Amino acid sequence: MAFATEHPVVAHSEYRAVEEIVRAGGHFEVVSPHAPAGDQPAAIDELERRINAGERDVVLLGATGTGKSATTAWLIERLQRPTLVMAPNKTLAAQLANELREMLPHNAVEYFVSYYDYYQPEAYIAQTDTYIEKDSSINDDVERLRHSATSALLSRRDVVVVASVSCIYGLGTPQSYLDRSVELKVGEEVPRDGLLRLLVDVQYTRNDMSFTRGSFRVRGDTVEIIPSYEELAVRIEFFGDEIEALYYLHPLTGEVIRQVDSLRIFPATHYVAGPERMAHAVSAIEEELAERLAELESQGKLLEAQRLRMRTNYDIEMMRQVGFCSGIENYSRHIDGRGPGTPPATLLDYFPEDFLLVIDESHVTVPQIGGMYEGDISRKRNLVEYGFRLPSACDNRPLTWEEFADRIGQTVYLSATPGPYELSQTGGEFVEQVIRPTGLVDPKVVVKPTKGQIDDLIGEIRTRADADQRVLVTTLTKKMAEDLTDYLLEMGIRVRYLHSEVDTLRRVELLRQLRLGDYDVLVGINLLREGLDLPEVSLVAILDADKEGFLRSSRSLIQTIGRAARNVSGEVHMYADKITDSMREAIDETERRRAKQIAYNEANGIDPQPLRKKIADILDQVYREADDTAVVEVGGSGRNASRGRRAQGEPGRAVSAGVFEGRDTSAMPRAELADLIKDLTAQMMAAARDLQFELAARFRDEIADLKRELRGMDAAGLK
C-alpha cells in the first residue's frame, strides 16, 4: 500500500508534478554479509514502528561506531521509500554514500553536494566601492553526480540521495527538467536534424573532435552523446528519420556495453526552459527592469541605473540568442514563473511526496539549514541596492527553515549527541543504539597536564606508528594546526594537515591515505569530528581541552572522543590543566556508555573484535571509468595514477599506474612535483600537436591531479 494513503504525513511542494512523472518501480534490497546485531535489531524495529504509526519526527541516539549507516539501510529496506540523507559536510556525505552504495548495490544511491572546488560569490563592498565578480571552479565529476541524482529521482523510486546542505539551494524546477528531456525509442520517427536542435536547446554542445560530458557528435546517420549525468556515451543510429538502434558505449574505446529499446536524455543544465517560457521570462525581466530603472532614476541614482541597464540588457540578449547567460540563476524567479518572495525549487521537489528524510549528525546539520538564508540575502541586498542586480535576484536563494520544514514529511534524526531542536520535536524521546555489533566499547579517556604535552604526544605517536596504528590530533586554531604539523614533520613524523581549503575529493583522498598507512598522523581543527569512520585510529589527542567554547563544548568533545571508538585499543588523551564542566559531562557520558557496553559484552560472552572495514570511498565511483579504459601509450589511467594505487601482492608499497609507473607521487618533494608538472605539460602539448588527443587528455588529467596535490602541499606548508 502507498504510504500517502496510510499516513497523511507527506512532503508538500508547489513544484512537484507527481501525476506527470512515471517512475519505474524498484525494490530496496540490502546486500550484506552481516545481520543486524548489538542494539541494531531493536533500533530498526522501533524506528519502523514509530514511522509506520505516523510519527513525524524520530530521533536515533546512536553512539559512534554502532552502525547508524547500516541501521539506515535496513530501515530503508523495511519502509521501501525514496530517501534523502543529509550530512553536515561533503566528506561525511561521500563516506555515507559509499557505505549505502555497498549495502544497496542494486539501487540508485546518489551523491549531491556543491560542485564548486572554489567559489567566490558576486558581491559589492560599498565602503570601498569594490565590486567582486563571481568566480568559481566547477568540479566536473561532482557536477555529473548531481545530474545523476536528479535524473534518477525522475526515473525510478528505489533512490537514496546523500546530500549536503546544498540540497536546499535553488535548482531548476523538476517539471521544466522533465519537459525539456528527450525520450527516444527504437522504431520511432525522429528527424535527425530536429534531434540535434533539441540537444542544443537543452545546452548540449556539438563537438566532433573532443567528445566530453555534455557534448554530442554526428557521423552520418549516427549521433553520439555523453549525457550530463552519465559515464557512458549513448549512440543513436538512424535509418532515414527512424531510430534503428540505441546503444550505451564506452566513450573512449567505442566498445558497446549494452543495447536498449528506449532511453531518456535529460538536459545538460538544471536551469532550462522552453521557448515559450523563456520568452515569457524575458518579458517579465524587461518589465521589472523598467520599473527598477524608474525607481533608481527618481532617487537620483543615475550611475546605478546605467549599470543595471547595461548588465541586464546584455543578459536578456544572451537569453534570446542562446537560451542561456552567465548567472542565469539570478533570473530563476522569472524563468520558473514564481511570484516575488516565493521560495525556489530545490532538490527536495524532485522527490515523490512520500519520501523519507534522514538527517545525519543532526546536532550540526539542523542549525546549518537554518543559517543559510540570512548569509545569502545580506549579500544580495547590497547588489540590488547598487544596481548590479534586479530585486528578483534575491529570490534565487536557499530555503528558510520554515520553508524547509514545510517541504519535508517524516524525518529521522541521527546523532550521538542530539541537539535541543530534535529532542523538542519528539518531546525528549529517542531510540537508543549504543551497543556495537563488534563488541567494541567507548575509548578510555585520560586527562593529562599541558606541560610537556607536545613531547608526550610525540612519544604516543611513535608508539602507535610502531604498532601500525593511526593518530588524530585536534587543535583550536588553523595557525596552531599548521605550526604543529611543521614541527612534527621536522621530528620525522609522517603527518598531514586537513583544513577547510582542501577541495572536496582531495579531502576524502587524504582520509583514505591515512587508513592506507601513507602517513600516521592527521592534524585538524573542526574536521576531525562527526562521522569520520577511521578504524585504524587508536589515539585521539585533544589539545587545549579545557578551553571552553564551541570546539570544546560537551557535544564537540563527545563527537571527538568517538573517533577512537572504532579501535579495540582506542584511547583519548585530553591535554588540560583543569577539568571543565564540558569535559566532565563528556567524560561522564562516555563512562556511562562504556559501562553499559562492557556489561552487555560480559552478559553475552562477546569478545570485542577490531573493525575490519574495506578502504573505499566516493573516489572509487567517481573514477571507476578509468579502470575500464583501454591502455594507450602511457598505460593505465592518469587520474588513478597520481593517487598511488597499490600493486597486487605488495600491500605496503604505494605505486602508480600510467605515466608514473613505479613512482609514488605522494612522497615527492615540492620542487620535484613542480618539475614533473612542467614536463607533463610539455608532453601534453606535443601530443596535441601530433593530434593524439586521447593521450593529451590523459596528460591533462594527470596534470590537474598533480596541481591539486601541489596546492595541498602549499596550504600545509610542505616543502
Curated annotation (Swiss-Prot):
SUPFAM superfamilies: C-terminal UvrC-binding domain of UvrB (SSF46600), P-loop containing nucleoside triphosphate hydrolases (SSF52540). The keyword DNA-binding does not apply. The keyword RNA-binding does not apply. GO terms for cellular component: cytoplasm; excinuclease repair complex; plasma membrane. It comes from the Bacteria. The UvrABC repair system catalyzes the recognition and processing of DNA lesions. A damage recognition complex composed of 2 UvrA and 2 UvrB subunits scans DNA for abnormalities. Upon binding of the UvrA(2)B(2) complex to a putative damaged site, the DNA wraps around one UvrB monomer. DNA wrap is dependent on ATP binding by UvrB and probably causes local melting of the DNA helix, facilitating insertion of UvrB beta-hairpin between the DNA strands. Then UvrB probes one DNA strand for the presence of a lesion. GO terms for molecular function: ATP binding; ATP hydrolysis activity; DNA binding; excinuclease ABC activity. Signal peptide: none annotated. Residues 453-606 form the Helicase C-terminal domain. SMART domains: DEXDc, HELICc. CDD domains: DEXHc_UvrB, SF2_C_UvrB. It is found in: Cytoplasm. The beta-hairpin motif is involved in DNA binding. Residues 49-435 form the Helicase ATP-binding domain. Residues 674-709 form the UVR domain. Belongs to the UvrB family. Keywords: ATP-binding, Cytoplasm, DNA damage, DNA excision, DNA repair, Excision nuclease, Nucleotide-binding, SOS response. ATP binds at G62, A63, T64, G65, T66, G67, K68, S69. NCBIfam families: PRK05298.1, uvrb. This is UvrABC system protein B. Forms a heterotetramer with UvrA during the search for lesions. Interacts with UvrC in an incision complex. A motif (Beta-hairpin) lies at residues 115-138. It holds the Pfam family UvrB_inter.
